């Protein structure tokens, strides 16, 4: 029944596997043979590969960024009510706190201390634990080389669509309630280039996971309050532990500066000396590499 939430109930929420990146490419090519990588990125951004979302777009010949935004942001759109429909029943009476936490994470407030500060100092450790372990809705992200017990942790929403829903639909509830779809579409469109920069990183990490060539894929950043603030987008350690591929992700390859990445890697090597034994490959991943 198309009036039902797209994910269904509890069992589907946990078990429904998204399509692989190569399958997403095959699907959009079937419906739009001349698709651009921008079309592909938009499809990945808004669906994360979830079959039902892709089906809704493709069945309605919605194959580019602007038409996807217009299809989602309108009267009686399942996408507008989707986050609420699939999660309120899951969370029960505590849904308000869970929604506030997920809303914070979607906007980049992504450490436990910062989330607690944003929510007035309430303790959220138990909520975060359940979001990670029971609901599989968020993931703990640690920088390369950090110990399991370390406190240098960020959280991210695992599902692309829910990340989008909390950042734009939930955050702009008053605009949604007024039905001011024109304004909401403008907010989403104006932010699209910036927002999809992070999603492009996620796309490449997913693609690398699917390649089965690596034993570790992640990123690295300095802890706060250190002299050299720097972040490396992707660090991937080969299956045989002899090669480390290090990438800066930029939508536009012309914005990549090899010297800047090399400086970051030099700093990383002062912290993670074991990497000096490996062959290091530095490079850029951009829209052209999707």
Where do the model's predicted regions map?
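Phosphate-binding site recognition
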Residues: 1-182, 186
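A cross-kingdom feature that marks ATP-driven nucleic-acid transaction machinery
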Residues: 151-290
């Amino acid at each position: 029944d198309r009036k039902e939430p797209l994910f269904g109930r509890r069992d589907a929420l946990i078990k429904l596997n998204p399509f692989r990146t190569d399958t997403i490419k095959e699907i959009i090519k079937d419906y739009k043979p001349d698709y651009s990588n921008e079309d592909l990125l938009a499809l990945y951004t808004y669906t994360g590969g979830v079959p039902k979302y892709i089906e809704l777009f493709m069945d309605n010949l919605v194959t580019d960024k602007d038409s996807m935004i217009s299809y989602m942001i309108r009267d009686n759109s399942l996408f507008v009510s989707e986050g609420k429909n699939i999660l309120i029943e899951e969370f029960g009476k505590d849904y308000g706190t869970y929604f506030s936490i997920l809303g914070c994470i979607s906007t980049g407030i992504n450490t436990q201390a910062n989330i607690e500060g944003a929510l007035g100092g309430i303790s959220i450790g138990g909520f975060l634990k359940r979001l990670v372990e029971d609901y599989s809705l968020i993931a703990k992200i640690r920088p390369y080389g950090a110990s399991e017990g370390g406190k240098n942790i960020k959280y991210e929403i695992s599902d692309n669509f829910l990340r989008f829903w909390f950042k734009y639909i939930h955050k702009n509830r008053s605009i949604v309630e007024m039905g001011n779809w024109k304004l909401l579409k403008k907010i989403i469109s104006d932010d699209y280039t910036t927002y999809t920069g992070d999603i492009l990183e996620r796309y490449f990490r997913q693609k690398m996971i699917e390649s089965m060539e690596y034993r570790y894929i992640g990123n690295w950043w300095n802890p706060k309050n250190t002299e050299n603030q720097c972040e490396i987008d992707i660090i991937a350690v080969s299956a045989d532990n002899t090669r480390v591929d290090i990438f800066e992700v930029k939508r536009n390859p012309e914005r990549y500066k090899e010297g800047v990445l090399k400086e970051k890697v030099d700093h990383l090597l002062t912290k993670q000396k074991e990497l000096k034994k490996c062959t290091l490959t530095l490079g850029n991943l951009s829209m052209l590499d999707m």
